[in-house]
């Protein structure tokens, strides 16, 4: 083989590598090409005016609204949404920067999760509104991690882009809510009632700061031993951290005859808990809270929310209450079961 022929492949390879370098997307491309600019135009300008956000993925739709300065989730009984969650979404959308130009063929949108026509699609649509006027409509698709990037396009355009950054979008309405709705301080609880059973805390020694729980002197009915055993183990710590799986306007619920009422007397005030056990065992239950604050207590935001909503508890939290209720209604001994205290 001649020396001239042996150099041809090397020259071809060099040319290809050179073309790859000069056509590789640059982080300093001009705004004229549409790159290096925000994926959501004018978001920073309109941010303060935005009062509505719609999110869709397939058949799932979420509506967030601002009313009198308070954000709420219309898809979850108008339950309040913390401003930090909204701000995080808007900041991440604003920081989403067009980095590389990708396909503008609608037939290839599905490959990067930007096809919104499929009911089971993974594309996420986000609409931003100001006084009912649509100001932005973007579609987010597949994410990559090294470096962090997201495929995206404007809903009215077929042109797609690979953008710098990620946007964390929750497509479950409950995911926008602070699901911890009750955190009563266990150490401040002094009395508990469960239906007709009353318990009082007695300090038996300095080492036991929380004391022990005994039947109140004013109990009128006999309390089965198993019910007392379960109540002592489970009730003192039960309301220290409650989380919900769903919310419902209180006016929309019909309470069954199998509703248990508990009260907790604590330093902050008196907590009244109603749990509807009318549904089948293992399915959870709806829970309502009412609160009478002690004199001089600063009113907490959650206290004002409690009368408006019911909270769906998981079976994990309902099981000990149901167990005590069953023991209260029975005179026979239950088989020894592990305590559920600390739930």
Segments (PLM) and residue ranges:
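Secondary-structure "cap/kink" motif recognition
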Residues: 1-343
């Amino acid at each position: 083989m001649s020396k001239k022929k042996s150099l041809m492949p090397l020259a071809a390879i060099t040319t290809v590598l050179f073309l790859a370098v000069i056509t590789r997307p640059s982080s300093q491309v001009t705004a004229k090409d549409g790159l290096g600019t925000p994926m959501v135009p004018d978001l920073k300008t309109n941010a303060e005016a935005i009062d509505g956000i719609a999110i869709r993925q397939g058949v799932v739709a979420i509506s967030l609204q601002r009313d009198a300065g308070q954000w709420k989730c219309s898809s979850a009984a108008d339950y309040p949404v913390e401003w930090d969650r909204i701000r995080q979404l808007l900041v991440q959308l604003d920081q989403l920067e067009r980095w590389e130009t990708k396909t503008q063929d609608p037939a290839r949108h599905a490959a990067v999760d930007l096809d919104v026509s499929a009911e089971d699609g993974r594309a996420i649509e986000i609409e931003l509104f100001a006084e009912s006027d649509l100001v932005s409509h973007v579609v987010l698709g597949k994410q990559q991690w090294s470096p962090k990037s997201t495929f995206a396009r404007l809903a009215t355009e077929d042109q797609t882009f690979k953008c710098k950054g990620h946007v964390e979008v929750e497509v479950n309405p409950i995911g926008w809510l602070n699901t911890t709705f009750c955190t009563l301080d266990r150490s401040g609880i002094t009395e508990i009632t469960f239906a007709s059973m009353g318990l009082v805390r007695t300090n038996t020694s300095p080492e036991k700061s929380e004391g022990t729980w005994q039947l109140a002197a004013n109990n009128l009915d006999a309390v089965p031993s198993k019910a007392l055993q379960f109540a002592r183990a489970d009730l003192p710590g039960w309301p220290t951290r409650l989380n919900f799986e769903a919310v419902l306007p209180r006016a929309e619920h019909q309470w069954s005859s199998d509703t248990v009422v508990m009260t907790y007397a604590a330093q902050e005030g008196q907590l009244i808990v109603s749990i509807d056990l009318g549904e089948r065992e293992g399915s959870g239950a709806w829970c309502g809270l009412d609160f009478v604050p002690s004199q001089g207590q600063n009113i907490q935001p959650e206290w004002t929310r409690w009368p408006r909503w019911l909270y769906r508890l998981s079976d994990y939290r309902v099981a000990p209450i149901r167990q005590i209720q069953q023991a209260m209604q029975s005179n026979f001994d239950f088989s020894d079961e592990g305590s559920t205290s600390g739930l």
